[in-house]
C-alpha cells in the first residue's frame, strides 16, 4: 500500500486477513471481500490519500466504512462465476478397484474388492472409515446384501476381500445389475454414503475374470410418484402394466433359491436328497430376516412317512444346511414319484410362514424336470442344481404349517 512520502509503509487489517485466509486455488477472496471495504475507483483509490477502508491503526476499519463498501463491488461476470461455483462440483469422490468373476458351473458370482483411492473426507479429522456393500438390482434387499469390513481413518483403504453370491443363473447375468456402494461408518449416527458404481452383469463372460478401476459416482435418487407430473405417472403405470402383461398371468413370485443334491444309490436301493443351502430368501419377520428350515415330501405318500425336515437356522436369508435324507425305494417306483421341497419360517407360538417351494418329478417343468431326469438316468452320481422357490404352496403342504 502506498502512503505519503516519508510515511511508514503499512498494511491494513482487511488486506492482512485476506492474505491469510485465501490459500490455494479455491480463490474465496471475492467472498471474503464482501465483508470488508474495498478501495473504489476515483481519486480516493490512488495517489497519496487514504481511501475508504484505509483507517488509522487505532480505529476499527469497519466502523469507518460506508454501507456500500460493506456490500463489495463485483462485476456481473464475477457474480455469475461465484453463483455457478460449487466446491462439491470439483471434488472427486474417489476411485474403486475390484474384480468380478462369474462361475457358470457353480452358479456363483465372485466380487473381490481390492482398494479405493482418493475418497472424499467424511469425518472431522479429514479422513473416513470406509466399507463397501453390494446389492443386486432390481430387488435390492437384505437377502442379497454383502458387505466388507470397515477400514479405519483412511482415504485410501485396501480391503482385498472377496464377496460371493450363490445361486446366480444365466438369466441373472442377462438382466441384473450389481450396485457397489462405498460408505463411511459412523458409530454415533447414521452411516454416510460416499459414492457408488453400477455394473450390468451382462458385461461379464463366464469363467473370465474382469478387472475394474472406476470413479465413484453420486447416488441419483429416483423421483417419487408424488413428485411426478400426472402425465409421467400415467406413463409409469402404463409401462408397469405392459411389463406384467408381457410376463404373463402365470408368472409366480420368486421367493429365493435352493441348492439341492439328488443321487439314486443302487447299493442302498434308495434316493439321497441333499439340502445344501438357500440364497436370497424372502424376509418374513419384522427384523427383516427369517428363521428358515426345509421340509421334503415324496408324493404320493400313502403311508405318510416321507416327511423329513432340517434344523432351523436363526435370523438369516442365506442359510447353509448341508443335511441329507434317504428314501428307500426301487428306481422303477421312484420314476413315478414327485419330490416336494418347501422352505418355511419358524415362529414360536403361531403358525409357521411359508416362504417358497419347488417340485421335482415327471410332471415338473424346465430345470426341475431336467434335474429329476438326470438323477434317474445317472445312478450313483450326485447331481446338484439350483432351483427357484415360488410362492405357490403345494396343496398337501398347506395342511402342516406347524410341523
Swiss-Prot record:
Q: Name one GO cellular component term.
A: synapse
Q: GO terms for molecular function, please?
A: calcium-dependent phospholipid binding; metal ion binding
| Chain residue ranges for the region called Interaction with UNC13D | 218-403
State the annotated membrane topology for this chain: Peripheral membrane protein
Q: Name one GO biological process term.
A: calcium-dependent activation of synaptic vesicle fusion
Which Pfam family, any one of them, does this sequence belong to? C2
Which compartments does it reside in?
Cytoplasmic vesicle, Secretory vesicle, Synaptic vesicle membrane; Synapse, Synaptosome; Lysosome
- InterPro entries in alphabetical order: C2_dom, C2_domain_sf, Doc2, Rabphilin/DOC2/Noc2, Rabphilin_Doc2_C2A, Synaptotagmin
In terms of SUPFAM superfamilies, this protein maps to:
C2 domain (Calcium/lipid-binding domain, CaLB)
**Keyword Membrane (UniProt):** yes
Q: Which cofactor does it need?
A: Ca(2+)
Region Interaction with UNC13D and DYNLT1: what ranges? 1-92
Q: Which residues bind Ca(2+) 1?
A: 123, 129, 184, 186
Q: Does the keyword Metal-binding apply?
A: yes
Alphabetized UniProt keyword annotations: Calcium, Calcium/phospholipid-binding, Cytoplasmic vesicle, Exocytosis, Lysosome, Membrane, Metal-binding, Repeat, Synapse, Synaptosome
Function noted in UniProt: Calcium sensor which most probably regulates fusion of vesicles with membranes. Binds calcium and phospholipids. May be involved in calcium dependent neurotransmitter release through the interaction with UNC13A. May be involved in calcium-dependent spontaneous release of neurotransmitter in absence of action potentials in neuronal cells. Regulates Ca(2+)-dependent secretory lysosome exocytosis in mast cells.
What is recorded about the protein's domains? C2 domain 1 is involved in binding calcium and phospholipids.
| The protein, known as | Double C2-like domain-containing protein alpha
The protein's organism comes out as Rattus norvegicus (Rat)
